[in-house]
Amino acid sequence: MSFNLRNRSFLTLSDFSTREMEYMLNLAEDLKKAKYAGYEGNRLAGKNIALIFEKDSTRTRCAFEVGAKDEGAHVTYLGPSGSHIGYKESVKDTARVLGGMFDGIEYRGFSQRSAETLAEYSGVPVWNGLTDEDHPTQVLADFLTAKEVLKKEYKDIKFAFVGDGQDNVSNALMLGAAVMGMEYHVVTPKELEPTKDVLDKANAIAAKTGGKIVVENDVKAGVKNMDVIYTDVWVSMGEPDEMWQKRIKLLKPYQVTKEVMEATENPNAIFEHCLPAFHNTDTSIGKKIEEKYGLSEMEVTDEVFESSQSVVFQEAENRMHTIKAVMVATLGD
């Protein structure tokens, strides 16, 4: 069966088939090889791309800008104070304005509905750079990195997310794993298990692809035989102190330590993280956490983060290659 991703938006991985997702991942591999060989393409030549960032970013912004420019596109960045979206101008109106000027739009913000509205009314491909509910571009990089390091087919890679089971990255990983027919464990406290809507959607997809979704409260049981141990920050910046205290109490037993990695009983297991990570006190936030809560490490220990099992910087680089693949697949000539 043939397919064409041109002019498709990239809002959530559940919108894609296994074959379509594999195509984007394989394209990312090809584009990465081409970049390493010194080849700069022109698949996006003459295209104008808008990057809407309601939330600041390092990896996502750089990945879109470098990826677009590598393939010949022009990029306009609209930061948190650089547009009227949702404040002085509705998302629907913004979509129609930008759709008349740009060939593609990246959106990184709060609401998944805003991303959907942009896609509905702009008339051009819209790419989800992160919302409170989902983070699909991150998952392509996570999967590509795991395949590169583990030398396994996607369907044979077993992922375990350890931490907040309602996290947007965990949601995206769960949906992506279901699409690819993978086994995916959410290792989380009872209070933070995935929402029924996301879990039901992932299970419905997995039933068709041969994937397996497991929710587990016990860390040792949840990580056994896993290939990839994944975590994310416990609390987003700007949340009140009470939330930090509550989350730390709930999630401290789910910190990824050397013992957690050993509990996989898999000597080849790797550690992934979407970054930034609070693994030491080298940042102002890290220092504040230590002063206020007595923790020098949060979701992952520095020992694991800096270990040979950690592939977080290869994973970060792959954000650019996979995002470039999404743009080329949906917008390229």
UniProtKB/Swiss-Prot annotation:
L-ornithine binds at residues 168, 232, 236-237. One of its GO terms (molecular function) is amino acid binding. Pathway: Amino-acid degradation; L-arginine degradation via ADI pathway; carbamoyl phosphate from L-arginine: step 2/2. PROSITE patterns: CARBAMOYLTRANSFERASE (PS00097). Keywords: Arginine metabolism, Cytoplasm, Transferase. It is found in: Cytoplasm. Signal peptide: none annotated. One of its GO terms (biological process) is arginine biosynthetic process via ornithine. It comes from the Bacteria. GO terms for cellular component: cytoplasm. It holds the Pfam family OTCace. Gene3D superfamilies: Aspartate/ornithine carbamoyltransferase. Its EC number is 2.1.3.3. It is an enzyme of class 2 (transferase). PANTHER family: ORNITHINE CARBAMOYLTRANSFERASE, ORNITHINE CARBAMOYLTRANSFERASE, MITOCHONDRIAL. Belongs to the aspartate/ornithine carbamoyltransferase superfamily. OTCase family. Reversibly catalyzes the transfer of the carbamoyl group from carbamoyl phosphate (CP) to the N(epsilon) atom of ornithine (ORN) to produce L-citrulline. This is Ornithine carbamoyltransferase. It comes from Pediococcus pentosaceus (strain ATCC 25745 / CCUG 21536 / LMG 10740 / 183-1w).
